[in-house]
UniProtKB/Swiss-Prot annotation:
Main location: mitochondrion
Binding site for ATP: 154-162, 176
Gene3D superfamilies referenced in this protein's UniProt entry, alphabetically: Transferase(Phosphotransferase) domain 1 (1.10.510.10)
Ranges for domain Protein kinase: 148-484
Organism of this sequence: Xenopus tropicalis (Western clawed frog)
Protein name: AarF domain-containing protein kinase 1
Length: 523
């Protein structure tokens, strides 16, 4: 076994180093940042992680407390090695690390907790390099475009950083500037990770994370094209124009390129900042409802989904005139377009999950590629235990014990989870990531798995399925029947929501006390 590891790692090192010399030899490269050093970091980190898992768990009986304890320690060490690698190699490595860190209910918590810092601690590009990118892309000096330009970025991410600035006419803008080396590095980094993951799979056949690389291959070119991001922002703004609470920054196309995006500057607090909301008298429950309504509309009705809703990309503020909370949605580089068949099956699956219809859960989970692992798939989608799925996920909130059980199961069922992620449609992968990010926000706000979120989802599913049926029918009577059924279902949901609000309100408490008094008086 040891010889096999050495042989695989050596083969990976030789092939990567030679491919690195070939690739980097075709352009400008700095050996201290790319080349042998960059490849060497990744190879050595992968070898160290692989060796740790093999040697530490070799002589311990699986399933015992000792095994679980040692495995957790190995997870922790490996996660920190990955974090160090991502921070050293930057760019694409940070992007992939962020993706893993967002899968809170799908990978062991040692990884998600460690890698989640990448959302807020990405390295910055030095200001002279930022100026150079603007000069190259806009063909002007920075002083010709802006009267003010803050050197310190508002925030830095894996692919770019954002600066606050003021245009010559006085308009405040946010300027997103791509890290200068990311474009050249991205394809090479993906090749590097792909070869390393293939090497690891030779040693651990149950290791099924090639889907992560396939997603990066597909999405990175889109995320690196800021003109595509601008088009996504405008499309989303048009799709959900009926939502008065949503704000999407306007794009200034005359100053935007594939590497520079100039947009309207909007201020607000991060959506998970409860203290900010309290200071500004923003209703937390109203924010949670609005966010759930927005994403239900994206996923179930339109099939056009913003897939990076981490707290830095979702801001909140109070409208000074209406005193209604507003959501500001930023960073429109990563979207998932759902096919109609996938979207409708996903609608039907969520309706089954909310209704605790086990037969329909099995049918639609299998249609979405889960096979006989459909119970695990249902748990992954809802972040609930199979027992809660059977009882009805809307009937009770997540207990502390259930939350701990779910997190521990992410480690226990990692081979099965990775098998599922490799078998479901590619569209599902970004939805799972999006679900986990939204759940993280709900948990921060203390509104996790609220009934209102399920009501929003149910409404959107009813509307989406009814619209599809109406489009497919040629019969006027059938069209009327579908419309009446839709109206009836939406009416039921409206009544249920009123009952829930009454139960939670002072009026509800008063009615309950009156009913108790009447009951005691009669008896």
């Amino acid at each position: 076994m040891v010889r096999g590891i050495i042989r695989v790692v050596s083969l990976a090192s030789v092939s990567l180093t030679s491919s690195g010399f070939f690739l980097y030899g075709t352009g400008h490269w700095d050996p201290s940042d790319f080349g042998v050093v960059r490849i060497g970091r990744a190879v050595l980190t992968t070898a160290a992680i692989t060796w740790d898992y093999l040697t530490e768990l070799r002589h311990v009986k699986a399933g015992t407390e000792e095994y679980e304890s040692i495995k957790s320690q190995v997870h922790f060490r490996s996660a920190h090695r990955l974090l160090d690698l991502c921070c050293a190699n930057r760019g694409t490595f940070i992007k992939v690390g962020q993706h893993l860190g967002a899968l809170e209910y799908l990978v062991p918590p040692e990884y998600t907790k460690t890698l989640s810092v990448l959302h807020s601690q990405a390295p910055c590009t030095p200001f002279p390099d930022v100026v150079q990118v603007i000069r190259e892309d806009l063909g002007k000096e920075i002083s010709e475009v802006f009267v003010e330009f803050e050197e310190k970025p508002l925030g830095a991410a894996s692919l770019a950083q954002v600066h606050r600035a003021v245009l010559q006419d006085g308009r405040k803008v946010a300027v997103k500037v791509q890290h200068p080396k990311v474009q050249a590095q991205s394809a090479r980094d993906i090749l590097l990770m792909e070869v390393l993951l293939h090497a690891v799979k030779k040693i651990f056949p149950q290791f099924e994370f090639m889907w992560l690389i396939e997603e990066a291959k597909k999405n990175l070119p889109l995320e690196l094209d800021f003109e595509n991001e601008g088009r996504n922002a405008e499309k989303m703004s048009a799709i959900v124009s009926s939502f008065s609470f949503l704000r999407i920054p306007r794009i200034y196309w005359e100053l935007s390129t594939k590497r520079v995006l100039v947009m309207e500057y909007m201020e607000g607090g991060q959506v998970n900042d409860r203290e900010y909301m309290k200071r500004n008298q923003i209703d937390i429950n109203q924010v949670a409802r609005a966010l759930g309504q927005l994403y239900s509309e994206m996923i179930f009705v339109h099939g056009f989904v913003h897939c990076d809703p981490h707290p830095g990309n979702v801001l909140v503020r109070q409208n000074p005139e209406t005193l209604v909370p507003e959501i500001i949605l930023l960073d429109h580089g990563l979207y998932q377009v759902l096919t109609e068949s996938f979207r409708l099956d996903y609608c039907s699956l969520w309706q089954a999950l909310i209704a605790a219809d086990m037969q329909q859960i099995r049918i639609y989970s299998q249609r979405l590629g889960a096979g006989e692992l459909y119970p695990l798939f249902a748990c992954m989608l809802t972040a609930r235990s199979w027992e809660s799925v059977n009882q009805g996920i809307y009937q009770n909130t997540v207990s502390r014990e259930e939350a701990l059980e779910i997190r521990s199961n992410a480690a226990t069922y990692l081979p099965e989870i990775s098998q599922l992620l490799a078998s479901v449609p590619r569209q599902m992968l970004l939805l799972l990531k999006t679900n986990d990010l939204l759940r993280g926000i709900e948990t921060s706000l203390g509104t996790h798995a609220s009934s209102s979120s399920f009501l929003n989802m149910s409404r959107c599913c009813v509307r989406a399925l009814a619209r599809h049926r109406k489009e497919k029918t040629d019969s006027l009577w059938s069209y009327i029947h579908i419309s009446l059924a839709e109206t009836f279902s939406l009416g039921q949901l409206q009544i249920y929501e009123i009952v829930l609000r009454l139960q939670a309100s002072c009026v509800g408490c008063w009615i309950r006390r009156m009913m108790q008094w009447v009951f005691l008086y009669i008896h």
